[in-house]
Amino acid sequence: MCIRDSKLAQHSLELTKQIREKYSFNYDHSSLGTMKIFRDESSFDKASREVERLSNLGLSFKVLTNQEAVEQEPFLSDVSEKLSGGIIFPDDESGDAYKFCKELEKVIREKGGRIHVNTEVKKILFNKRKVNSVVTDRVEIKASRVVLTSGSWTNNLLKNTRLNLPVKPVKGYSLTLDTSILNDTPKMPIIDEGIHTAFTPLGYSLRVAGTAEFAGFNDDIHQKRIDYLYKTLESIYPTISANLDLDKGALWYGFRPMSPDGMPYIGPTKLSGLFVNTGHGHSGWTLAMGSGDVLADLMLKKQPKIEVKPFLASRAV
């Protein structure tokens, strides 16, 4: 998290809590916080200074020695001597993004929203530079306002507009392992800053996510990336790695929509009625609810609840 998007992340977290409590969402969520760990003094000292700057923006954290980090997450005891320290963020939450979306889908349908599944959007039609309709492979939908939330594929729908968002796909992998056979498992999400990998407990599973591959939309699964995830698991949780059936890990990959400055594009474009909400990179769910709220305010010409200038789509389109 950087200073520019910390307010958006905090706003998003609060809205996520409100939605969860209001509709009793179940998505293996945890409110135990998250912890970053560091394996060298230089990166640990640098990160400690950076979070001090964020504290002025309301970010809660605590800098930990390696032993204090183990006290927070005992499963780190196997690697305690390799750690320089950690930083815990007690207000952070985690959960299964897919399950959250399924819960959200139910609420949307219950409130009269329509979701067209297995439907490909072909193009957006305009009349005198104003949105007129959306053409799909099944039906044409009349609309005066359209929001593009198509991630790394956003520019595919901008081809006939002369607009171009500098959003590029960055391929990321995750590996989800069944931990139901274990008597005990880690409780807190751990981010190993040195190897840019996150280890997140999700109910009776442990998800290992990391790597960044700049290869366009190439959907080949590279074995070395998978091997890397297994290797990182062994490097942080050797006991768990030795007791799980690693051959049954569920592999996933996706294309994160990255912007050049790392900030999302939210809001209106130069074409009347056309809005975008994309470019969130690896922070998609972290910023999701806040981004949606900001976008709704902009569409309704209301004052957003946070400063939005750094995120406005108008800086690109």
Predicted features by range, described:
Residues 45-57, 77-145:
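Helical element adjacent to the flavin cofactor pocket in flavoenzyme catalytic cores
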Residues 18-29, 59, 110-115, 163-164, ...:
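Surface-exposed helix-capping loop/turn segments at secondary-structure junctions
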Residues 5-13, 36-46, 71, 87-107, ...:
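Short beta-strand to alpha-helix junction loop
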Residues 77, 121-131, 140-272:
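Active-site substrate-recognition segment that forms the wall
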Residues 65, 117-119, 250:
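Short loop/edge segments at beta-strand edges and connector loops
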Residues 112-114, 206, 274:
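Short, conserved active-site loop motifs that form the nucleotide-linked donor/cofactor pocket
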Residues 61, 68, 193-194, 218, ...:
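C-terminal catalytic lobe of FAD-dependent flavoproteins
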Residues 1-67:
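Dinucleotide-binding Rossmann-like beta1-alpha1 core, especially the glycine-rich loop
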